[in-house]
Curated annotation (Swiss-Prot):
Keyword field contains Transferase: yes
UniProt subcellular location: Cytoplasm
Annotated protein name in UniProt: Protein-lysine N-methyltransferase M142.8
SUPFAM superfamilies in the record: S-adenosyl-L-methionine-dependent methyltransferases
EC numbers, comma separated: 2.1.1.-
Purpose: S-adenosyl-L-methionine-dependent protein-lysine N-methyltransferase that methylates elongation factor 1-alpha.
Coarse class of the protein's main subcellular location: cytoplasm
Organism name: Caenorhabditis elegans
Length: 218
């Protein structure tokens, strides 16, 4: 009896199904890289709930205005922390197209690394200090949307924000209204009048907080 006799062998049907699955996954990767796939589906296991388009555009408009206000340095740097769907809308702005702003996405979901390879940094809030040294204290504006409504998640995300932001960084935080006390104590933030909305009508009461006087929110 050979050493391989006890090793389970996959049936021909199983091998064919596995091969088909791998081919489909590779096709999706190639479509993401080529831009054929415009929208990445939510992964609820990662607590992903995408904004509706109006919310995305309003957050982007505020981020651009805040980044360019009071600073002549160009490009102004904007960081998106766990808010990947905003990237597409930043790309549509004239300020991005003309090089007035520079964008970096800090995100756990590597699918966005395929879609936005030059602007993507893999980020896990559980390891808040695992950040590229060259990006520390570089950002004028940070827009963050921690994936979970939990104190630990917000505390660690806030730690990352403090490391990434300049001393006068402007921060927009989108999270559940129940996190208001933590937002205030951790980053001296106040609730704005803007209420983010999600494409799939997330049931939680959601709010936008800022550590500065916002420019475009009524």
């Amino acid at each position: 009896m050979s050493d391989t006799d006890d090793i389970p062998q996959l049936s021909a049907d199983t091998l064919a199904a596995l091969s088909m699955f791998q081919a489909e996954q590779q096709e999706k990767i190639e479509q993401l890289q080529s831009g054929i796939i415009e929208k990445i589906d939510e992964d609820w296991q990662l607590s992903q709930f995408w904004y509706d388009d109006e919310t995305s555009r309003k957050l982007v408009a505020e981020g651009v205005a805040a980044a360019l206000e009071g600073s002549e340095a160009r490009p102004a740097r904007i960081g998106c922390v766990s808010s990947p769907t905003l990237v597409k809308f930043f790309h549509e702005t004239e300020e991005y197209k003309t090089g007035q702003i520079q964008l970096t996405l800090f995100e756990f979901d590597d699918r966005f690394g395929l879609k936005f390879p030059t602007e993507f940094v893999h980020y896990d809030y559980k390891h808040p200090t695992d950040l590229p040294a060259e990006l520390l204290a570089k950002f004028d504006v940070i827009i963050a949307d921690p994936p979970f409504l939990a104190a630990e998640c917000l505390i660690k995300t806030a730690h990352s924000i403090r490391l990434l932001g300049k001393s006068d960084v402007k921060v927009l935080l989108c999270t559940g209204a129940i996190m208001e006390d933590y937002a205030s104590r951790l980053m001296a933030m106040h609730r704005t009048s803007f209420e983010p909305r999600h494409a799939n009508n997330l049931a939680n009461d959601f709010s936008c907080f800022a550590n500065y006087q916002t420019l475009t929110f009524c």
